[in-house]
From Swiss-Prot:
BP-aspect Gene Ontology terms: DNA repair; methylation
Annotated TM spans: none
Catalyzed chemical reaction(s): a 6-O-methyl-2'-deoxyguanosine in DNA + L-cysteinyl-[protein] = S-methyl-L-cysteinyl-[protein] + a 2'-deoxyguanosine in DNA; a 4-O-methyl-thymidine in DNA + L-cysteinyl-[protein] = a thymidine in DNA + S-methyl-L-cysteinyl-[protein]
Record-listed E.C. numbers: 2.1.1.63
CDD domains xrefs: ATase
Family affiliation: Belongs to the MGMT family.
Active site: 141
Taxonomic source organism: Bacillus subtilis (strain 168)
Domain of life: Bacteria
Enzyme class: transferase
Miscellaneous field: This enzyme catalyzes only one turnover and therefore is not strictly catalytic. According to one definition, an enzyme is a biocatalyst that acts repeatedly and over many reaction cycles.
Gene symbol of the encoding locus: adaB
Record-given protein name: Methylated-DNA--protein-cysteine methyltransferase, inducible
Length: 179
């Protein structure tokens, strides 16, 4: 098989009211889907990002990722240790890495992220890169809000963004979560 067409392994993560698809290659997590979206969301993303790749359902291969995401949803995990395989431009990678630096339970604005990557005039491009983040939750784009503190767009939808931010605020105030 060609190296540019990796096999994508996928699973449906179900925890309480949370249901979303996750996918990985042998190198790491590549996709965390939106809350309660059909599998077509994953298939459409895979066709664009990894055209011609084989998609294989494999709960066992996805178990390490599912465990950490579930721990996060339980309020028992602040940081992720599973590998993530980023597939994006250098600019997108810079933005996604900056997102991973936002502390658990805190938020930043799009202009904060633009400043963090030394591109203060690139606020709109930062927004586009955040919108292209394929790995929700583990690359915490839900922690980015408007400069005035308002909730802004999120691939998973406003309800999912609100739930994630509330989860982090609640978990941060209730206990000191181990890393």
């Amino acid at each position: 098989m060609e190296t540019n067409k990796p096999t994508l392994y996928w699973s449906l993560l179900m925890f309480k009211d949370w249901n979303f698809y996750i996918a990985s290659t042998l190198k790491g997590l590549v996709f965390v889907g939106s809350q309660n979206k059909p599998i077509e969301e994953l298939f459409e993303w895979a066709r664009k990002r990894f055209p011609g790749s084989l998609l294989v359902e494999d709960d066992d291969k996805l178990e390490p990722y599912a465990v950490e995401i579930t721990q996060y949803l339980e309020g028992k995990r602040k940081n992720f240790t599973v590998p993530v395989e980023y597939a994006g431009t250098q600019f997108q990678l810079a933005v996604w890495n900056a997102l991973c630096e936002i502390p658990y339970g805190q938020t930043k604005s799009y202009s904060d992220i633009a400043n963090d990557i030394n591109k203060p005039a690139a606020v709109r491009a930062v927004g586009a890169a955040i919108g292209a983040n394929p790995v929700l939750i583990t690359v915490p784009c839900h922690r980015v809000i408007g400069k005035n503190g308002s909730l802004t767009g999120y691939r998973g939808g406003f309800e999912m963004k609100t739930l994630l931010l509330d989860l982090e605020k609640r978990a941060s105030s209730e206990m000191d979560v181990p890393h």
